[in-house]
Amino acid sequence: MRVLGIETSCDETGIAVYDDQAGLLANQLYSQVKLHADYGGVVPELASRDHVRKTVPLIQAALKEANLTAADIDGVAYTAGPGLVGALLVGATIGRALAFAWGVPAVPVHHMEGHLLAPMLEDNPPAFPFVALLVSGGHTQLISVTGIGQYQLLGESVDDAAGEAFDKTAKLLGLDYPGGPMLSKMAQQGAAGRFTFPRPMTDRPGLDFSFSGLKTFAANTIRSNGNDDQTRADIARAFEDAVVDTLAIKCKRALEQTGFKRLVMAGGVSANRTLRTKMAEMLHKRGGEVFYARPEFCTDNGAMIAYAGLVRLQSGANPELSVSVRPRWPLAELSAV
């Protein structure tokens, strides 16, 4: 079975073709980073308009890359939420229309289920059960995963997501949008221990997160210590260490609570090298294993949507006959496979 995946939930247009026998046949991605850079963040209307311009040409490019025609596609998967409503509607409308024209089923995919399943695209995919850390600009969640669609929320951020905190702190440090990856690069030049940031909510029981206070702490630290290059690098290092330590502490608790030996990291922040190293060390000490996707599949992409849609279609998911999206969509509401 070959599935065309369409991802348009935010500021990246991702198109891919996944085959249940041959694996990933095509992967096309267009990023709107330059479009939104002058505004310091994603402008929803601009994002939607750009998806309108880019989605169909990228679908054509993906089919060409895979050396396929429309007749070779057996199903269409599109991101139906969560995300920006206008951006979601572009992908959903195009996906549903193509499926109708091609006479194949269309299936709506949960964006975060796509991220959660992205490590399944690798040569060494995780087996169930596992704890999943979904960590991105919009979400920071710990999920108990016992099967496809069998998700139990263990904890989540009560304010800013980790990726959002990275971007906001990067802006305080004078870095351009999107600043998270640049903050991590700057942190590599920072001295460990010059500044010590708090590890929020680690001094109390539970698995929830809070990252908004770290941004305030960073602002106060910058104000009190100047803004020369080395100081900025040292602050970036202290901030990143605090976020990584906090995530590791909570993941360890989640593994202890569930008794699972496997941890899956997904979402844009899961590409962070410091985070990967920290989690690998923690899992090694526990006799467990950590899994994550290659960096290009940590951020938004069509491959994860194509794969998640394939799994849903093969399990007998009812094809969608209408176009509907859900800007807010709890992961726990998904049906089990």
UniProtKB/Swiss-Prot annotation:
Single GO MF descriptor: iron ion binding
Cofactor: Fe(2+)
Residue positions binding Fe cation: H111, H115, D300
Keyword check for tRNA processing: yes
Domain of life assignment: Bacteria
NCBIfam families, A to Z: gcp_kae1, T6A_TsaD_YgjD
Described function: Required for the formation of a threonylcarbamoyl group on adenosine at position 37 (t(6)A37) in tRNAs that read codons beginning with adenine. Is involved in the transfer of the threonylcarbamoyl moiety of threonylcarbamoyl-AMP (TC-AMP) to the N6 group of A37, together with TsaE and TsaB. TsaD likely plays a direct catalytic role in this reaction.
Family designation: Belongs to the KAE1 / TsaD family.
Protein name stated in the entry: tRNA N6-adenosine threonylcarbamoyltransferase
Source organism: Serratia proteamaculans (strain 568)
